[in-house]
Amino acid sequence: MGVDAPMLTVGKDSKGNPGAPPLSQMFSTAWYRNSPAPGSNRGNVIINVHSYARGAALGNNLYQSGGLKAGDVIRVVGQGGQVACYRFREKIKFPVSSYDPRSGIYFNTTGRPQLAIMTCWDRNPRTGEYDSRIIFYADRVV
């Protein structure tokens, strides 16, 4: 895809969820500092990105045709210049209403070492909220 996206380090937002980049930074990413660090040997490295109802944000580009394809390599560069590489494996989409934070699909500090990039999807025009989430999984390349 050829995307060079800055990565912010974030904690929890005002609702207690892992933070996201500011809405004005549509092509930035946000690493949740309470998840394993990029390059870790275990668990989900949680990264959040935005998608917009009218397109034109990183999450839209990842999901829509021409976006991430199985086997694509994602390079994550830390503040000290260290590089961790991941190979995109799959994406899942699920309704927010059925999500269980204890399921391990997003929060997982002990499982296989992988990126878990999440974006919101299916904006509800009535409520202004997003009814679905998409998680893109990429395995750590050693």
Task: Show where each model-derived region lies.
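Solvent-exposed, non-transmembrane regions of membrane-associated and secreted proteins
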Residues: 1-142
